[in-house]
Amino acid sequence: MSGWVVAAMDALNYAGAVRFTPESDIPDLSGKVILVTGGGLNQVKAEEAIKSVKSSVSNDVEVVWIPLDLMSGKSIKNAAEQVNAQSSRLDVLILNAGVMALPPGETEMGHEIQLGTNHTGHFYLTKLLLPTLLKTAEEPDSDVRVVSLASVGHNFAPAFEKILDQEKLKKSLFAALGSKFLRLSGSTVQQGACNSLWAAAGAKKEELSNGGYHVPVGILERRNKWACNEDMGKRLWEWTELELTKANL
C-alpha cells in the first residue's frame, strides 16, 4: 500500500508549512474512489452536504451517502458491504469521523462511546475494506492511501496504561502500526480540511512519511512517545482484534 496517513486536528498551522491550495494543487482524480467517514450526522445533513459539493464540481463526479454508525458493528459491516458492492476499487480512505465530550455511554461492543467511535469502529471498518484497498494497490500506477484524523491532544495523554485521552493515542498507534500509516492537522473548517486533502490527494508519494505524523500543512512532526512505541502499538492491535472476536465481528 502506498501510504497510511494520520491527520491531527490543530487550531493553528505550523511554521514551515508547505504551500498548498486544494483548488490548484490536487491532481486529476478521475476514476478514483474515495471514502470519507463523518460526512453528515444523518441522511438529511449528508444530502445537504452532497448538494453543496455537487454545485461546485463537474456533473460526472458521483457523490453518494452510505449510512454508517461507528458504534454499531452491524452498521459498519453493512457500510463496508455497500462500498464493495458499488465499486471494485478504493483509492483513498479518510477516517474523518470522530466524537468527544459526550454523556457517559457505551457502544454495542461495550466500549466507551468516544473510544468505540474514534478507534474501534474505524479499526473494524478499515479491516473490512483492507482487501479492496490492497487489490487496488496492485493495479498499475495506483496510489492508495489511508488518512486517519487525530489530534495534538494525543500529546497530553498520560502513561499508556491510563484511560484519559487514550482514544487519541490509540488512533495514533493504529495509524503508525497499520502499514505503517500517516497523520495531519487543521484550523477553520476550510483550513482544517487542507491537511487531510494534502495527505489524501495533494502530496506526492515521496512527500509522505508512511506511518508518520503530519501537522498543517504537510509538516512531519514528532509524536507522543507512546504513539511511537511498537510494543504498545502491537498490544493495541491485538487487543482490538480480540475485542472484535469477542463481539463476533
Which residue stretches match the model-derived regions?
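Rossmann-fold NAD(P)H-dependent dehydrogenase/reductase core
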Residues: 3-4, 10-174, 247-249
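Pocket-edge positions in alpha/beta enzyme catalytic cores
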Residues: 68, 184, 225-228
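Short alpha-helical patches at coil-to-helix transitions and adjacent helical residues
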Residues: 73, 119-122, 189, 193-196, ...
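Short, solvent-exposed loop/helix junctions and linker helices
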Residues: 116-119, 186-189, 230
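SDR active-site lid
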Residues: 162-163, 167-209, 216
